[in-house]
Design a protein with these regions (language model features):
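Conserved acidic
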Residues: 1-661
Length: 661
């Protein structure tokens, strides 16, 4: 129960009652609102709970006990910035943040390098220099965000880093579910309350620019009812009362309300109307190349503005979906096919296909190539999405009390148009073939044609030789061909396997691991770190050419060699074997070597080959696994998992002809 005095003064309960009275009016027009309000008040008093809350200021080490209803009123009155995880910040007018000034300066630096980069020829030295510098600025900004979660940081706060992460997740989910709704109308309604809330948002809009009759009018409530009932979570298990409520609400709608409900999130029905069909034909008849949705050509600006104005009024539902983070993660998606930390990857092919079949051949004055029309189609969709997301973020930041002058910095930009994307089951691990980057066509053979994210073969521990060869297989045999031929990929991997074996057994270092070795004191257990013991082994045997640490070096994988395996080599290498026996197997770390043997040998960064003494001790199979095994997730995505062979404490992997069907 909630105290009646608390109920009367709570702005949250007042808002709840107002919204519910509007919903009941949809179903029962002319209902006695005073009597209904009395019933709602009784319900909230008898069944509501005003839970306790705690407001904690980590900087000032202050705590204030409160309740949910009082906290809501406090937020409405004080207008703090609302961040993820129930975290609140004072805005920039009330408190100065030096670290925020640093972030803004670094963002300005990044924009400077991005702008200067775009003045250089794509792929030139100057272009790559400024691309690197803008990337460095981004890393510096992200480093500040990460530092806030580190207790040793001077401005450490218990909540800031988590709040930043959750705010980002919240905004990505908000934009992702909005894109999904706009492009494919796929979000489902999980309750009758979801449906009525959607209706209420449409009916409560204060002003519309266009008369509803500019589009084909929907006067039959049954058409609209079928559309919304089919979008309930489990239509086959709908309660009869839910269907009755939807039908009754729609029976009471005016012709205008039915029409506006029908076109909301119904993009393709909207595009099929004569008015919009004609605008799209006019756009294609301009024969204008459209490569950058952030910079619409002057010849298209008026058409795109008109198209957006109609879409914004009739199609866009500019409100947040409830539980959007969970919805985006669990509900079926047809438009947003990938979500990264700060990105939504949108599937534009259905939109392009629609324009091809419905518009391209109606634009009789269009003389563009197929690729130019594809780019035009994709960027029409992306330009609409850009404006839709800007409207959504404006509303979102306003509701979160972000100052208007700061809200513009919260944005999503369109950066890439891809022709193909290969996804893997592992989060944030994918490969794309880039067609356009920030308005510039990426030619075949460009260094940035292939964009690889998160794969092991692109990480620091993998030698550049194997990384380049595996990337080339992806580009030539997966991303460029219209159809992927698995046999060709396996043939390339088989040839690469033979090349690795030949290289390793002949003492070449092309396929060694690449390890970073720090000072031993930097590790909790340096005696078990491969980078440390590999350098120690080299420096012990070859003191005349020592490896200085800290450093990055190539590391040879050995078979876990113990003294009995080294004895046959004593005749040819007596001095080296004696050192190994005395300082390693009988040294201070002898327990480790008795169990594991010699597993790693570092090589100096002078290009020298693997010493002849160690050639028979190289673990060729483990070297193959550590190199080709980094390609495992790529092949698994194509239905060709690696075979595994377990021996002792190692799991060797190799490719066969087994398909995962």
């Amino acid at each position: 129960m909630i105290d009646p005095d608390v109920v009367k003064r709570s702005s949250l309960i007042e808002r709840w009652m107002t919204e519910n009275i509007r919903k009941f009016n949809m179903i029962y027009p002319g209902i006695d609102e005073k009597e209904l309000g009395s019933i709602l008040l009784d319900i909230i008093q008898q069944k509501g709970t005003n839970s306790k809350t705690l407001l904690h200021n980590n900087y000032q080490r202050q705590e204030v006990s409160s309740t949910v209803l009082d906290m809501y009123d406090w937020v409405q009155n004080r207008k703090p910035i609302i961040a993820g995880g129930g975290t609140y910040f004072m805005n920039q007018r009330k408190a100065h943040s030096p670290i925020y000034t640093v972030i803004k300066r670094r963002k300005k630096d990044r924009k400077f390098y991005q702008h200067r980069r775009d003045t250089h020829p794509l792929g030139s030295y100057e272009w790559f220099h400024d691309e690197m510098m803008q990337g460095e600025s981004k890393v510096k900004i992200n480093a500040i965000y990460g530092s806030f979660g580190t207790p040793s940081f001077q401005f450490y706060n218990l909540y800031t880093a988590a709040a930043t992460t959750l705010t980002s997740q919240m905004m990505i989910a908000a934009t992702g579910i909005a894109i999904e709704a706009f492009m494919s109308d796929s979000p489902v309604y999980e309750s009758i309350d979801d449906v009525l809330y959607f209706f209420d948002c449409v009916f409560s809009r204060e002003e519309y620019k266009y008369n509803y009759s500019v589009l084909p009018v929907i006067s039959d409530w049954r058409i609209v009812a079928e559309r919304y009932i089919s979008k309930m979570k489990v239509p086959s298990e709908l309660k009869l009362i839910d269907i009755a409520i939807i039908e009754r609400a729609l029976k009471n709608c005016t012709e205008e309300q039915l029409t506006r409900l029908y076109y909301k999130n119904n993009l393709y029905a909207f595009l099929d109307t004569p008015l919009i069909h004609g605008i799209l034909i006019d756009i294609f008849n301009t024969n204008t190349n459209f490569l950058n949705p952030n910079d619409i050509p002057p010849e298209l600006q008026t058409y795109m503005d008109v198209l957006w104005n109609y879409a914004e009024e009739f199609v866009v539902w500019n409100h947040n979906w409830t539980e959007r983070i969970r919805r985006l993660a669990t509900q079926e998606r047809r438009a947003v096919i990938g979500v990264d930390t700060d990105s939504n990857m949108v599937h534009l092919q259905p939109f392009v296909d629609y324009l091809e079949t419905s518009i391209w051949y109606c634009a009789e004055y269009n003389t563009q190539t197929r690729q130019e029309k594809e780019f035009m189609s994709a960027n029409i969709a992306t330009a609409l999405l850009t404006k839709m997301i800007r409207k959504l973020l404006d509303r979102h930041t306003e509701q979160c009390n972000v100052l208007p002058e700061e809200a513009a910095d919260i944005n999503m930009k369109n950066e890439f148009l891809w022709s193909r994307c290969l996804w893997t089951p592992v989060k944030k691990r994918y490969v794309t073939k880039v067609l356009i980057k920030e308005g510039k066509i990426i030619p075949e053979g460009s260094k940035i044609e292939l964009d690889i994210k998160g794969f092991d073969f692109k990480k620091a521990a993998v030698n550049k030789s194997i990384a380049d060869k595996l990337a080339n297989i992806i580009l030539i045999h997966i991303m460029r061909p219209e159809k992927i031929n698995i046999s060709n990929i396996l043939r390339e991997l088989d040839a690469l396997e033979k090349e690795i074996i030949q290289s390793v057994t002949s003492g070449e270092r092309d396929y060694c691991l690449r390890m970073s070795c720090k000072e031993p004191r930097a590790y909790a257990r340096p005696e078990s770190q491969g980078a440390v013991i590999s350098v120690q082994l080299w420096n012990l045997i070859y003191p005349e050419n020592p490896i200085q640490i800290p450093t990055k070096c190539d590391v040879v994988l050995l078979k876990g060699v113990k003294m009995d395996r080294l004895e046959p080599l004593r005749k040819d290498y007596p001095e080296q074997i004696q050192k190994i026996e005395k300082y390693i197997f009988d040294g201070p770390n002898k327990a480790y070597y008795a169990k594991h043997g010699l597993k790693y040998l570092a090589l100096p960064n002078d290009g020298s080959r693997v010493p002849k003494m160690f050639l028979p001790l190289i673990d060729v199979n483990w070297t193959l696994t550590r190199n080709l095994g980094t390609f495992d997730s790529i092949m698994a995505s194509l239905g060709v998992p690696m075979n595994e062979l377990k021996r002792k404490n190692k799991c060797y992997k190799y490719y066969g002809n087994t398909l995962d069907v």
